[in-house]
Design a protein with these regions (language model features):
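Short hydrophobic alpha-helical segments enriched in small aliphatic residues
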Residues: 5-7, 22, 29, 37
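N-terminal polybasic/positive-inside topogenic patches
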Residues: 7-12, 34
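Hydrophobic alpha-helical signal peptides and transmembrane signal-/tail-anchor segments
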Residues: 15-25
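Short, Lys/Arg-enriched N-terminal segments with co-localized hydrophobic residues
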Residues: 34-46
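Conserved beta-strand-loop surface patch within small alpha/beta domains used
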Residues: 44-123, 132-184
């Protein structure tokens, strides 16, 4: 068993809120900590996103080739409980041709969805690059996150020799959860 305990204090009223969560050790690995404006903490489960090394390498190359602009695409695959397995990556055109935001070509999006359906795959989410900023959703990314079940993958090229690739979920209230990313 693993035990998580933490407290927060509001200076105005010295209110101490203590939460103790007891989970099996296999569940603890997938927990993330978030904070609301009210200073109340809570735990949320993250998903496991599984991707083949060859797909990861293809995304790195595609995004590097797109620098200094953001690159983007869609991912499709299978969902099995809390595991989303990426089976196909769709590389799409960034119509904005810009280094701080992207707009996917709608014709390419439609073709990708049509292809995924024909292969019996589920659309899992999207990926894009951050040429100069960290691998985390920007305020614009959160604002544009329309599907709380989608995976939002971001590759940062703050250091071109060491790109950082992370996967996130964004809920309806725009809270972000980092998912576990497995490259296999």
């Amino acid at each position: 068993m693993c035990r998580h305990a933490f407290a927060t204090c509001r200076s105005q009223d010295y209110l101490i809120i203590l939460f103790i969560y007891v989970f099996s050790s296999s569940v603890c690995a997938g927990l993330t900590l978030d904070k609301y404006e009210s200073d109340i903490f809570y735990w949320r489960m993250s998903m496991v996103i599984r991707m083949k090394k060859s797909d990861y390498d293809s995304i790195v190359r595609y995004c590097l080739d797109g620098l200094p602009n953001e690159s983007c695409g869609l991912i499709a695959g299978f969902v099995d409980g809390d595991v989303k397995s990426v089976e196909k990556v769709y590389f799409l055109t960034n119509l904005d041709n810009n280094n701080v935001h992207f707009t996917m070509d709608p014709k390419e999006q439609f073709a990708a969805v049509k292809d995924a359906r024909s292969l019996g795959l589920t659309m899992l989410g999207n990926f894009h690059s951050h040429p100069e900023t960290p691998s985390r959703p920007s305020e614009e990314d959160k604002r544009l996150a329309y599907d709380s079940t989608a995976v939002y993958m971001i590759m940062s090229f703050m250091d071109n020799d060491n790109p950082v690739f992370k996967a996130f979920g964004v809920d309806k209230d725009k809270n972000v959860t980092e998912h576990v990313l497995e490259i296999v």
